[in-house]
A protein has these predicted regions:
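A short, small-residue-rich loop immediately preceding and capping a beta-strand
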Residues: 11-14, 143-145
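Short beta-strand scaffold segments in enzyme catalytic cores
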Residues: 13-15, 21-25
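A contiguous, well-structured pocket-lining segment that forms one wall/lid of small-molecule binding clefts
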Residues: 65-145, 155-157
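Glycine-rich phosphate-binding loop plus the immediately following alpha-helix
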Residues: 5, 20, 27-70, 95-96, ...
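A generic structural signal for well-ordered coil/turn residues at beta-strand boundaries
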Residues: 10, 19-20, 72, 85
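Glycine-rich beta-strand-to-loop/alpha-helix junction loops that act as flexible
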Residues: 17, 145-154
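Conserved phosphate-binding catalytic cores of ATP/NTP-utilizing and phosphoryl-transfer enzymes
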Residues: 1-11
Length: 157
């Protein structure tokens, strides 16, 4: 609210960072309810781990986003995880899928296309979070949403 005083409850907030991935229904300034959360790795944590796997520098979010600029987001078919809880998310399987792509390429003595894999990963994360946020907005009737946390700074949004 500090930087956007025009944002008035009720609204939904996607908090996506290295430590949290939550969809929060904000009913009033002191009354909120967590609708969904990550069941394993937070989105930012997944970005950091994927960056390390791809040989990109820390922090992973900006590094993956920068590499993804020239990549093809459709080059790799990464999984869409299915989890219990309508608004919950999971990123550990996605992170493992990236590691598996890198390992497959190494076993075949092939080069991995870092921009393509970064773009595919970034697109999948953004798609998962956007889908859950829009589903929550439709179900709650929320007219406003906000994004918070380091992952929210990703240019893909």
């Amino acid at each position: 609210y500090l930087t956007h005083p025009e944002l008035k409850p009720p609204f939904l907030c996607l908090v996506a960072s290295g430590g949290h991935s939550h969809i929060v229904e904000v009913q009033d300034y002191t009354h909120y309810h967590i609708l969904g959360h990550t069941v394993d790795d937070a989105a930012g944590e997944a970005f950091d781990k994927v960056a390390r796997t791809l040989g990109l520098p820390y922090p992973g979010g900006p590094s993956v986003a920068n590499a993804a600029k020239t990549g093809d987001s459709k080059a790799y078919r990464l999984p869409v995880p299915h989890v219990d809880g309508k608004y919950n998310v999971s990123f550990s399987g996605l992170k493992t899928a990236v590691l598996n792509e890198v390992n497959k390429a190494q076993m075949k003595n092939e080069e991995i296309n870092v921009p393509d894999l970064a773009a595919s990963f970034q697109e999948r994360i953004a798609g998962i979070l956007a889908e859950k946020l829009l589903l929550a907005a439709a179900d709650t009737g929320a007219k406003q949403v906000c994004l918070a946390g380091g992952v929210a700074a990703n240019g893909r949004w």
